[in-house]
Design a protein with these regions (language model features):
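Short amphipathic alpha-helix adjacent to the substrate-entry channel of hydrolases
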Residues: 103-122
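Gly/Ser-rich "nucleophile elbow"/oxyanion-hole loop immediately N-terminal to the catalytic nucleophile
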Residues: 148-163, 183
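Proline/glycine-enriched tight loop/beta-turn segments at coil->beta junctions
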Residues: 69-72, 79-88, 247-249
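A glycine/proline-hinged amphipathic helix-loop "lid/cap" segment
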Residues: 1-76, 318-324
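Catalytic active-site module of serine/aspartate enzymes centered on a nucleophile-bearing elbow/loop
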Residues: 299-324
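Hydrolase active-site cap/lid region
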Residues: 178-233
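Short beta-strand/loop motif that positions the catalytic acidic residue
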Residues: 254-256
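Alpha/beta-hydrolase active-site loop
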Residues: 131-153, 309
């Protein structure tokens, strides 16, 4: 049975439409700037069809960056109904370390703010190849430190601080959590990594199996890692799968699709977290490809994926709002 035949039927149609419009998918676009433009346009069209997120306030702010010559842009999301203390979430967008922005995942961050009733900060980290590692994780860690130090002004409880990201954002969430552990600040109460990009070696069976889905596959992943590392060897902050010691990380939620090339590295990482004594919840979704819940939001599988995520965040952050 081919990979395409194993895709959840309701999640397959949007993928087929994408490949009809763009043969070969995103990976067929050689120029990185053109690829970014195409993906940004597609995401704008996709999010325009989603229901609006109400009852939140959004503010962009510049903060000091690790490089004193630069500033980081963070986008702050606050519920309009402020009552008591709220949890805090640092949200890290995906895009293979080479694409994406706070704008491309604005709807996700806003949805988390409204649904969890959380203060959410999304960080506009620098992208490769223009800025190779460690720029990305440095920016994310700087945003996490800033967020924690400004908790009172932002309006969240530092004892309920989580980090959330998907794909490259999931890898950066884990890397940032590793850095926070090593620097002993700030203390994270939870990390959620959705199909995280964490292993530069591309040696797992799934990394060799998923080669032509069109969303994110082996060729795209190898190319992105090459750009991200910029010719240097990967350390644990670049590729968390290389970390030898996973103890001391916060309770963790990982999910990944059966047909995602990150499947095996994510399953192995979850196993190692458990062996290191880290409370870990793992979900592997049959029929799901990389980011399928974003491309097919109306599919029942996508709704199931989001329900599990929201439930986990509410449990971890001790909130009592309705799931969706």
């Amino acid at each position: 049975m081919t990979i395409q035949n194993r895709i959840d039927p309701a999640s397959s149609l949007p993928l087929e439409e994408l490949l009809n419009t763009l043969p070969g998918g995103f990976n067929a676009i050689e120029d990185i700037k053109e690829r970014r433009n195409v993906i940004n346009s597609l995401i704008r069209m996709m999010t325009a069809e989603l229901p609006p997120i109400d009852n939140i306030v959004i503010e962009d702010r510049n903060i000091a960056a690790p490089d004193a010559l630069l500033e980081l842009v963070v986008r702050i999301y606050k519920p309009t109904r402020i009552s008591g203390s709220h949890p805090g979430i640092l949200f890290i967008h995906g895009g293979g370390m080479i694409m994406g922005s706070i704008e491309t995942e604005n709807h996700k961050a806003a949805m988390l703010c409204e649904t969890i009733q959380s203060i959410v900060v999304s960080v506009e980290y620098r992208l490769a190849p223009e800025n190779p590692h460690p720029a990305q994780v440095q920016d994310c860690y700087e945003a996490l430190v800033w967020m924690s130090k400004n908790a009172a002004e932002l309006g969240f409880d530092t004892d309920r601080l989580a980090i959330v990201g998907g794909s490259a954002g999931g890898g950066l969430a884990i890397a940032t959590a590793l850095m926070a552990r090593d620097q002993e600040f700030p203390k994270l109460s939870f990390q959620m990594a959705n199909y995280p990009m964490i292993d530069d070696r591309n040696e797992t069976p799934s990394s060799k199996e998923i080669t032509d889905v069109g969303i994110w596959d082996r060729k795209a992943n190898i190319e992105a890692w090459d750009w991200y590392l910029g010719g240097k060897n990967a350390d644990e902050y670049a590729a968390p799968a290389r970390a030898k010691d996973l103890s001391g990380l916060p309770p963790t939620f990982i999910d990944v699709g059966e047909l995602d090339l990150f499947r095996d590295e994510d399953i192995e990482f979850a196993k190692r977290l458990l062996q290191a004594g880290v409370t870990t919840e793992l979900h592997v979704y049959p029929g799901a490809y990389h980011a399928s819940e974003s491309f097919a939001p109306e599919a029942e599988l996508s709704k199931q994926i989001w329900t599990k995520r929201i439930e986990a965040l509410k449990r971890a952050l001790n909130t009592n709002n309705n799931v969706l």
